[in-house]
UniProtKB/Swiss-Prot annotation:
Sequence segments annotated as region (Pleckstrin homology (PH) domain conferring phosphoinositide binding specificity): 1492-1625
Region (Catalytic loop): 1728-1736
Protein known as: Phosphatidylinositol 4-kinase stt4
Domain PI3K/PI4K catalytic per the UniProt entry, residue ranges: 1593-1861
Pfam families in the cross-refs: PI3_PI4_kinase, PI3Ka, PI4K_N
Region (Activation loop) residue spans: 1747-1771
PROSITE patterns: PI3_4_KINASE_1, PI3_4_KINASE_2, PI3_4_KINASE_3, PIK_HELICAL
Region (G-loop): 1599-1605
Record's keyword terms, sorted: ATP-binding, Cytoplasm, Kinase, Nucleotide-binding, Transferase
Catalytic activity: a 1,2-diacyl-sn-glycero-3-phospho-(1D-myo-inositol) + ATP = a 1,2-diacyl-sn-glycero-3-phospho-(1D-myo-inositol 4-phosphate) + ADP + H(+)
Biological role stated in the UniProt entry: Acts on phosphatidylinositol (PI) in the first committed step in the production of the second messenger inositol 1,4,5,-trisphosphate.
SUPFAM superfamilies reported in the protein's UniProt record: ARM repeat, Protein kinase-like (PK-like)
CDD domains found in the cross-reference section: PI4Ka, PI4Kc_III_alpha
Gene for this chain: stt4
Amino acid sequence: MDCIDKSIRRESLRKLGCLPDHGWNLFVQSSNRYSKLLEADSKLFKAQRIEDTVLSICEVTLENKASENALTLFQQLRFYLLNYLFLEDTSEYKSVLCSLDESVYPNLLPLTANICPCILKALLALVRQHRELSSDIVKFLNSIFLALTRILNTPHSSNNNPTHTKTTIFEKVFYASHLGFFFEEIADACISALPQDACLWAMEVCNTILVSDLPCKLIDLHNDSFLHHSNYYAGFGLSYYLYLSSMKAYINSSGCLWYEDATSFWDIVKHRPSSPEEKPFLTQFQSILNLSDKFLSKTGTLRLQEKLGTSCNLFFVLVLKLALLSSSYIGFVPYTYSDWINVLLGSISEDPELLPHLIELMASLACVFPTHFQFAMKRLRLIAIYAPRFDDGNVTYAQLASRKLAQLFNYSSRDTAITSIYQFANLLSPADTPDSYLAAPKERLSISDNMSSSSSQTATVNTISNYLNVIDSVREIALTVNDEKIYGLAISLLIQKFSRKFDSRVSTELVRTLADISTKANDRDFSILVQFYSIQNKMLVKNGDEALTIAICDSRCLIARGTESNSFKRSDLLKSLLEEIIHIGIVRDTPAPELKGYYFGMSKAVQALVECVAGTDWSSLPKEEMYPALFRDMWFTLVINRFRYSVDLGETLEVDLENIAKNSPLLVFEDFGSNFESNLELNTVLRTHIEHSVISQIKSELLVRVPNIDLKPLSTSEICFLSAVLLLESLRCKSNKLSALVEYLLDPSLRDSQLPQSIRAIALYNLTSFVESLSKERRVASSTIDEFQKLLCLCCNRVDCVRQLALECMNYIMETLPHLLGIKEILFSVLELSSLLWKARTEECTDQYVPQLLYKSNKLNLSVILSDIYSCREEVLFQFNRHARSWIQNSSKAIPYQVKNLLESYLADFVDFDDLEVVELGRSLAVELGTRIVSSDRDNFVLPAFGNWTPDTSSEFMAEYTIRQRYSHVDNSILNIEGDMSTDRIDLILNEKSKLFETHLAALKSLEDDILQGNTVSPQRLRNEVRKAAAHAVQEPIFQFSVLARKIVRIPFLDFSPSSFKLGITLWNWMMNQVPSFSSFLISNIIRNWKNEIVTEKRGYFSTAKSKSPLALPMTYSPTERASFLSYKNKVMSQMIPHLLLLQLIAGNFEGFWYGDRQTAKLIVHFMKFVLKKITSMEVNLNVLTRELHFKFVSFGLRIAENLLNSPLGSRFYNLCVDAGLCWFSGMPNWTYGADKLHVAAEISVMRSLRDKLDSFLLRYPLKVSTTLKQKLLIILLNNEMYMLYTWLTPVLHGRNVRMVEPIPDSDAASSPITLEMLQVAWNVSPNIVLYAPKRFQNAPLKQMALNFVIANPFTSVKHEVALEYLFEHYPSGEFPIDRKFILYWEPMYPVSGPVMFMPNVKWNPQLLQYTMRSMESYPVSVTFFYVPQIVQSLRYDSMGYAESFILETSGTSQLFAHQILWNMKANLYKDEAATVPDSIKPILDRVMDKMINSLSGEDKQFYEREFTFFNEVTSISGKLKPFIRKSKPEKKAKIDEEMKKIKLDVGVYLPSNPDGVIVGIDRKSGKPLQSHAKAPFMATFKIRKEKLVDADPEELAVNGTEEEAGDSAKKQTYEVWQSAIFKVGDDCRQDVLTLQLIAMFKNIFNSVGLDVYLFPYRVTATNPGCGVIDVLPNCISRDMLGREAVNGLYDYFRTKFGDEDSIAFQKARSNFVQSMAAYSVITYLLQFKDRHNGNIMIDDQGHILHIDFGFIFDIAPGGITFESAPFKLTTEMIAVMGGSNKSQPFQWFQELCVKAFLACRPYAHYICQAVEVMLDSGLPCFKGQLTITHCLERFALNLNERQASTFMLHLIEQSYANKRTLMYDQFQKATNGIPY
């Protein structure tokens, strides 16, 4: 090892010793070997390798080793220490130094001086780490100490042999030096905790040396042989050195004994030292005090100084510290300490090294003995001012003193610190000013009477040093006290004291000190400081002071580095620097003599800016500060002031600008680009006078650099802008950043200007330099890879010119540097973006109306924002795919092997199968292009095309990929049975296999338990455990395989998620392929678990929970929440997909089993028979989302039946399949859920395949008549279902429809082939099939046949509500031709139908009324609550008291229901708004109200009184406002605020319009009078506390409909909102109540099919005749208010508020507008909303259009004139928002959504009309009797089929499209009421 470098050898030995076990043993062997060599030959002592060994042992010892290892180390260290000290290993440790030759003396001392202290340090470390070895080590060290003192106490030899005398002297010097080292190591070791026995021993040996006067005996030794070189001790001699080192060790060991470490007593920050209550070491500390007193006595002092021949001040300081330590322990301090301190302070000019000890001493003295506090404070302050300074860069004495001073402030009041700051700051006055304090100081002359006048005079002269000390002191006090006010005070005072009259050194130090304090100051003080720097630097431009300029620059750099990026302080500094550079640039017109330091000042500001912009995230900066504009102005300033790209900027400045450019935002930001050209022309910098010569120079430079640029049509501002862009982006390009130039074109206003071609030219100019610099790099940096990823994302940008420029740049780069695609991240990015673009394009098929705009890659940090226009997405996909192919093919020619390997890696790079999309373009592209890469064997390509096939390399590519996959996770374990197969080897293998089996079994069992207990199981864990177990199972025999396989099959069923089943099915298939003989076992276990799932768990398709009609669910007055029905869809699909995957698995393997394993095939047949029986017995959930699964079950059943038809079982099985198919049609015909076209297409495809198979069966097999009839009926129903779904899939037949399925002919909608015989056999299968058939076909005879079945089979029909509907349709009076007893048992009707049963047209029928009551009572209050207006109106016809009884009973269970009933009854007491004409129902209502109120008691009574009292107080404000009707708005407002203050807020009260929330606060200043001529409505705002469900099961909510029944998983969360409400008086609100009630019903209907439309039925509650409460729509503005704000049109408003048409915000807002426009348009037509002027149309902050004020609906119009003849309002400005024409995609979305909304609500037309019909006699002006209902039904066009209805709606859209009558009405409203349009 001698040939190895010594540092490497030493480090290697150290690392070896730190290793456990084997490494440690090798280390011990090596150490022992060298120790034996040393014993054998002492000459080896000088070998360097021995030294390295010893030092490595010492370093290993410092690590915390085990006890046995520590003993070994101790023995080694003991051996080496004795050898290096030349002591015999005997009991007396005699010296053998004299036996050495004198020639070795000069080399001997440096060697031992290096080694021995290290050994001592290591031994003391062992004492600290291993208490069990402590006594042995201390005993050994004590022996060494005794040996050394014995040698040193030995007198000189008396013989006259000079050689012997020389040896003796050297021996004493040698051992005296090592004794000093001994004490120094003890002192260092005591800094950390040492055991008490070790501390006591150290104190003892120190005391021995100091008492014995041994050092004085060595005074005559030669000092030139002294080894220790120290700044403090050099030249003192051995004697003094021994005194100092032993005293230092004494101090530290005493402190360690007391505080467990030597520094704690002196560290007054951690704690305040004080005398302990218990004093176990009193004797020791008393002896210390006695020794100290001896040395500090006058006799002892003079004696020591006389012997040593020096002042010994440093020693006396140390003695004083030891005395203070001991007296502090004892609790008594002699008065002599202060005298000694004064004496020693007088010596600081001679011995400045005393100061650190004196400072520490005084601080501790002040803490322990408060009587000395002021004494210490005064002297510390004087030291802080007048201490000498040295230019060594270390901490100054002034800093040390002020730091201790500040620490003492913690033990006094904060005022002391403030006073000191003031005192120090007041000393800062230039020497030539009258108030200069330091020029003639007085206080400093009285430190002590013992201080010499010479020292005072010296301090007087050195004022600069004193100024610097004062500044240091202020800084240290501020930073140490750490108080925000202190920071602010220090900054304020130092800024005030700043003066240019100071010496430059003082000014610069003050500036730097401010920087040190600034980062801790609050934001306000920091801003003041930043402005101070800025002002000073601006002044320096005219009056140059380079030192001060540099100091300001350094200070701001320090501040920037000390603040977090994007913090307020960094942002404030950034803003200041930018403004400063701009300001300096504007002074360019100042005469040249005044511009001294102009360029220097600007360059220094730029230098500070470099630090400031580092790491700044521009997106998080405050937008109101306009940082991009400041940067833009800064670059403009640089350009017009000679700092241009073509000018030699200087090396330093160019690097600084390059760093700024790298972190600078674009000169044009997309978010701020709405007025680019005007901002440019009005720019502050560019508006200043720019010399013509400067402009000419800029033009010529641009033309030279970018020859293709055309400057002729550009203005001066635009030319300067281009020059700034060239400078910024060329500098940025040097950092390999090119994408920023492309991003300029994202600004819409820039694109509209004349600059895009110029930007393109600059980009192409920089492109060449970008490629050149990139080609010189040996390795592509990660930042450059990020840049390429940005460029690739820009290649997919939605803006065409951005995309084209990015593609042009990428094409050039890829052609020039094809090896770039050999970088994994870049190639993967190309493929990932291809996949993202494909996914985006398919959104038209999966989520058409609300497409995702932002797409992110899960694998890479990639994101692209795309347009919502699918034609644009198609173009982007086409272009990128074409270029991506070209890039990869080009690179594969240059680096084929790298590209091929990366393509294989990409294909292999996925977590699991469920992470893959069904179609991923990137993966397909990788396969396609990978198989085309030229093979290594080029001979293959000379082969001819045999068999019309051209040879390629696809087989080679797939072979390499397969090998990669096979060996990527190979486990080279002991299970590899190849090779040695001895008996021991086989036993070992079997043993390991058994262990692995147990391990996997335990892991699967743990997985099962966690899932069963509901613990969270990560997908990663589930995948890993099950995969490993499956891989092991296939290697095991049948028993072990069966054990593992059962659990591998069961776990996915327990987890029951799509991902777990995808994994499970993949593994099950793989296991069946690996071990075919176990396939039947696996299939049987899968079927057993599936059957158990169906029977016990009943999830998904086999759930017993049935989805309810939207009319049976609660109706809510809230906006449409798309997330809720998406969550429901995802929940249902997640439980349906597992069944679908299992069916695919079983069906895919059936044929193989049928011909290979008939027993297993029969098992499948029996299972399918079980499933089909479940279906036919209606034990399945026929949810609309399970349509595909249902018909796949039937299709698979038919496949099985085809194999069984020749057997007796076959006919029955086939019949069962047909019955199961018919069962789907036993419910209401439903549309699909959501906008997933792929799902609809799949459903149509499955049904078409099933229909074709049924047709073939009719032709091929003779079947029974009943089976044939059912089969024909099923075919008819399938055709109709497909026709209905096809209509939904293509609601508008335009050219934009994606061709996904074959068109369905209109003939499939007909029902003519359905015969009575078909219905008869269908009735036997399920009566619902017959009952719901008329709902599918517009066929009167079919409906009559269904009615006949009901009449003939009333007992069977009672289970079906629709049967009663047919009876009422044909017998509206209720006189049914059936036994009335059956009515009592009928399925409950919907709550909306209940009140209709009380109307006069239904004849009195007790059974019917009882059935009505049972129906109403079967629904929870949360459902019936919605129908309060209808229930109240039913009292009008309630001759038997049933409705009254229902009201009273329900009111008893729900107080909120009771309150709503009471308010509605009050509102219906009178017919007119003035409450003068009583309604005929008034007596009934009065009676019922009295009963309700009288029945209240207890809490209910109190709640009623609190609520109604509170509400009356609020509404009474309107009455009090009436005298102010003709007063000004401020007067009205003042009156409202006055009354609002009087309102008492009681517990639990609520707004009538918000019964689901409690008022917890009132904004008493929110009152606002509303415009009215003779009434006094007003608006007020309340804080309402509500509850919402968190983690509710969406499926349970949809099924059960109420939050109370939403399952245990749901948790309620409380939240608060501010809700404004309008309190109207004199206006009948009942019509608004009805309208919004109907809108809420429409919302439920639309939600039931997951339709992407938006409605917001806000709340209105009528509380009294002509009175009501109206909720204010939040975050909305009316269209007429936009007109009053001079907005030209809706499109302009959208662009102003949401950005350019290409922006995400605009596209989201436009999508929201389309969704809401479609819903309100359909409802406007159906309910005939009139008076749709712009005052009644609102736009919210998300772009939704909302309608309000429904005073004219149904058969009433303003003025009785039907002015608005259009079906709904569709003006040109609305069309403009939706694309501008009827050919645009958004408008076609509008058409499709209108059609779908119309189709979705048609099945519920009668129920909607029932809600209206019961209100006909209420006296509302909108009704014209029964004619209103007739007209309403006609508008639903129920006589048309689905396609005809869609055409009908399209015709209505065409009629409304820019209708002139609509425009005329808006003009009329503007002329009459001043409403803009």
